[in-house]
Amino acid sequence: MGKSQSRRDLFKLGGLGAAAGVVSSIGAGGLSLLSPQQAYAQAAPTSLLRTVLDRKKLIVGTGSTNAPWHFEDEKGQLVGMDITMARILSQGLFDDPNKVEFVKQDPAARIPNITTGKVDIVIQFMTVTAQRAQLVAFTRPYYLEGVALLISVKGKHKNYKALQTAGKSVRVSVLQNVYADQIVHAALPQAQVMQLDTEANAIQAVDSGRADAAAIDLSTVRWLVKRNPNAYIDAGYSYYPQIYSAAVRHGDQDWLNWVNTAFTVAMFATEGELYDKGLEDYFGLKPPVRKPGFPPI
């Protein structure tokens, strides 16, 4: 029996109403709880929740080349925060984080693979937009991405305030796109903009000293600082928030509700071991303090 299952059983034994478990009936015999079989029967016959439980594995569409979200480690195993979120679902379904089949896909395949049923869910650093929500159903957010400024330990500017003070003398590298100037100037209005063809080259410009800072994803900044604290610094300013969520097929409320519940429990309640480890491993962040009372969600 897994640690999370033991915790669930402990709460059940408490017999304290809704906080102790899901009450199925109150009669002469007192409180009774839904068995796994009864809980299973509550899902609609056509729900993917039933299909996944019957199949005994979860099929997840994701990528394999974008740290810290989804990438292969030195052993060739998929790791990253997206992979962690998938394992959280597997843990909730089967009390085993490893009953997952990962389908590696390009970002362009995320929506088609959901709508055609090739995968049960896509967890692949997917930005939520109103347009995409017409095609797939988004889960509750699990990350708020943004733009941040990466600077070198060897650079002359050590934080965001120093970059601001330097004014026109600051050079900022950024991935080439139509909004590049706008992205940089939103944080540093007077900075010189150096557009480069890849994010890797934008980072390399900081390494070589050609740029004082790189305007890149906040998650990438955190990942690089976590891995190379002697090389990089987070300047301490982030902006342009974008929501990351998982995506499922439209029309299956039971499946969507279950995924949302599993994510919420991992992020805010008693079963956060996997989520907390992901925060530390991939972002260098301390796990959130979970305090009883009104939820911060």
Each PLM stretch: what is its role?
Residues A43, G92, K154-G155, S169-V170, ...:
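Extended ligand-binding regions for polar small-molecule ligands
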Residues A28-R55:
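C-terminal segment of N-terminal export signals and the immediately downstream linker at the start
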Residues M1-G21, G29:
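N-terminal secretory signal peptides and thylakoid transit peptides that target proteins
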Residues A109, F125-L135, H185-A186, D207-P241:
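A ligand-binding cleft/hinge motif common to bilobed small-molecule-binding domains
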Residues R87, Q91, K99-Q164:
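Acidic, polar ligand-binding/catalytic clefts
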Residues V100-P112, M194-Q204, Q242:
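Short helix-initiation/N-cap motifs at beta->coil->alpha
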Residues S64, Y143-K154, L218-F263, F283-I297:
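Periplasmic-binding protein-like
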Residues K57-M81:
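Short glycine-rich His-centered loop
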